[in-house]
Amino acid sequence: MAAKIRREDEVIVLTGKDKGKRGKVTKVLVEQGKVIVEGINVKKKHQKPVPALGVAGGIVSKEAAVDVSNVALFNPATGKGDRVGFRFEDGNKVRFFKSNGELVK
């Protein structure tokens, strides 16, 4: 199945503690059905120092993955999250917003 949400897409979170927040997709984990979104689902990790690699220890903040069903592509025309469909235009498969039919940029 084709990916409805891709890297660099702007998405809005539908559920959870970050509900309503927007961010840019930095990574798509296809096998797990998850995405990593900038500034969303930030977790703290206790990092041990590794002097051989020059890595300092401490508490590091890192974005954790969010299930793809908990985010929707942000439609700038409506200002809301929207569903995405596919259609062919000039022999190319393109994504479009289902609410107003505009192409996803």
From Swiss-Prot:
Q: Which organism is it from?
A: Tolumonas auensis (strain DSM 9187 / NBRC 110442 / TA 4)
Can you say what this protein is called? Large ribosomal subunit protein uL24
GO cellular-component term (any): ribosome
Family that this chain belongs to: Belongs to the universal ribosomal protein uL24 family.
**What InterPro entries does the entry give?**
KOW, Rib_uL2_dom2, Ribosomal_uL24, Ribosomal_uL24_CS, Ribosomal_uL24_KOW, Translation_prot_SH3-like_sf
Instruction: Please list the coiled coil stretches.
Output: none
The record describes the protein's role as: One of two assembly initiator proteins, it binds directly to the 5'-end of the 23S rRNA, where it nucleates assembly of the 50S subunit. One of the proteins that surrounds the polypeptide exit tunnel on the outside of the subunit.
- Gene name linked to the record: rplX
SUPFAM superfamilies for this protein: Translation proteins SH3-like domain
UniProt keyword list? Ribonucleoprotein, Ribosomal protein, RNA-binding, rRNA-binding
Subunit structure of this chain's protein: Part of the 50S ribosomal subunit.
Biological process according to GO: translation
Recorded hits in Pfam families, A to Z, give: KOW, ribosomal_L24
Listed GO MF terms: rRNA binding; structural constituent of ribosome
